C-alpha cells in the first residue's frame, strides 16, 4: 500500500547541469554532497532501508534518532538535515516538511525511513534549483532570481502575487529582500504544492477552476496553518 502524502508537491525537475553529471557517471548525490565519499557501512538501521539507499541517508537518520524509535520527530529531523548539510532550516520549514512528508495515516508529525528517503532526495533537487538561480553564489536569491526559479517550476505567478510572496520575507530594514535556501524551500513548497492542487481542479490548464468553499479551505489551510 502506498502512503504517499497527497499534499506533497512533486519534486522539481533537475537543472541540465545536474542531469549532465548523471550522464557523465557521477552520483546524483554528489551535487548536494560534493565532499562525501561513500564507503561500505554496516548499521542496525540498514534493514529499515532499501538496499540501494545511499549510506549517507542511513547514517544521518540513525544519528538523529536519539530515542531509537525508528522515526524522526521535529528536533530529530532538524539534526538529521543538519548532519546532511542543510544547516539553518527554520522551525516553520521543518514543520512544513514534516506535514508534507509524514505518513498520512499517522496522527503524529514524524517521518519513518521511507518518508525520510523521499524528503532527502527531494531536498537535493530543491537545492539544485536554488544553486542554479543563485548565479552569484551569494547563498541568497533576489526577487528576479526567485521569479525565474518559479517559472522553471511551472509556476507563472502574477506580479501582484510574486510581490506578496517576497514581502513575507521583508525584515523591515528597507534593504533589498533576498531569500536564503530555507526561505526559498518554504515558499517554493507552498507555491508549487498549491499550484498542483489547483490544477487538479483545472485539468484543461485554463487558469480557472470552480471550487466549493470546503474544497478551497481543504486545499489551502494545510499549507499555511500548521507551522507557527
From Swiss-Prot:
SMART domains referenced in this protein's UniProt entry, alphabetically: EFh
Show the Pfam families listed in the entry.
EF-hand_5 (PF13202), EF-hand_6 (PF13405)
Using the chain's own numbering, where are the disulfide bonds? none
Q: Which UniProt keywords apply?
A: Calcium, Metal-binding, Repeat
The answer to whether UniProt assigns keyword Methyltransferase to this entry is no
Which residues hold Ca(2+)? Answer: 65, 67, 69, 76
Q: What PANTHER family does this protein map onto?
A: CALCIUM-BINDING PROTEIN CML48-RELATED
Q: What job does the chain carry out?
A: Potential calcium sensor.
* Protein's name according to its UniProt entry: Probable calcium-binding protein CML48
Please give the organism.
Answer: Arabidopsis thaliana (Mouse-ear cress)
- Annotated gene: CML48
